[in-house]
Amino acid sequence: MKLSYRPINLPFEYPFTISNGRTKTHQPSLLVALELGPFMGFGEAPAIAYYDVTVESMIADLEKHRRMIEKFALTEPERYWHYLHHLLPNNPFLVCALDMACWDLFGKMKGKPLYALMQTEWNQTPVTDYTIGIDTIDKMVDKMKAKPWPVYKIKLGTENDISIIEALRQHTDAIFRVDANAGWTTKEALDKIPQLANLGVEFIEQPLAKDNWEGMKLLYKESPLPLFADESCVSEQDVKKCVDHFHGINIKLTKCSGITPAIRMIQEARILGLQIMIGSMNESEVGSAAIAHFLPQLDHVDMDGPLLLAQSIATGL
């Protein structure tokens, strides 16, 4: 296989802020391609400062291991993921991009879309939400009114959380989902969640710190709304821990290291009775297209990266 890559840095339509106060105006990412004969597969790895992942560090790893990445004799994507997992053990973002490109390449070689390779049929697919980042209440209302949508994910974790939802609810009957990004204490969550339920919120994503399992166990028993794990469920090893602490999991392809482990996480979550969501890390159309092929297997989806970014780099979604 032949490896190529391209760094990109796409502006957000609006500055994007979450509960820890981080604000982003651009999303840097690395696009990768694997070429074999007349076929080419594409993948994407967003650079996330919170995880100490930069475009520059990913490029350095690609060049360091280029020969090993290219020499693999492709027979099936799962084998390539295991190979990459050992070759790049500390870089799940880059493994994800290469795994994504491999599945895309393999599907083109077989003449099948990814969802068919996963033996699913294209029916009953959920609609993505549209995320509204933390801002002043007036600006959050303006963002929502500028983008009419049936499902909104609203970032919370402020002193004004209830006022934010009350203000937004005055302007729409759309479905609301709340993402606290681990920004609440157990006491705050116990106080806020019943109020949010009365305002028509559908579920809460990651209310507490990722390692606050004791608090989550209490919240799981008391919450009138379903609770979804994000930061608490990064890899395959985390899925089982979420039982009796969360009602569902939000899988991020980038964080779990790709399509291959995400397939296994979904299978395990179904066996354990957990609801399943796949979430975005502000990927462009390239990474979002990979998420889209999982839609028939999901209860919910958050793949709004192309809606949040001000520029498009690909077509097909």
Language model: regions and residue ranges:
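N-terminal amphipathic alpha-helix/helix-capping segment at the start of soluble metabolic enzymes
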Residues: 1-8, 19-29, 33, 82, ...
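Flexible C-terminal active-site loop/helix
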Residues: 1-12, 24, 37, 279-317
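Metal-dependent enolase-superfamily TIM-barrel catalytic cores that perform enediolate-based chemistry
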Residues: 112-223
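Metal- or metallocofactor-binding catalytic centers and their adjacent structured scaffolds
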Residues: 35, 40-109
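Hydrophobic faces of well-ordered beta-strands that scaffold small-molecule active sites
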Residues: 41-43, 126-132, 150-154, 176-180, ...
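Short Pro/Gly-enriched beta-strand edge/turn motifs at strand-loop
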Residues: 10-18, 200
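Conserved, mostly hydrophobic/aromatic
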Residues: 31-32, 38, 98, 111, ...
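Catalytic alpha/beta core domains of metabolic enzymes, predominantly
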Residues: 211-305
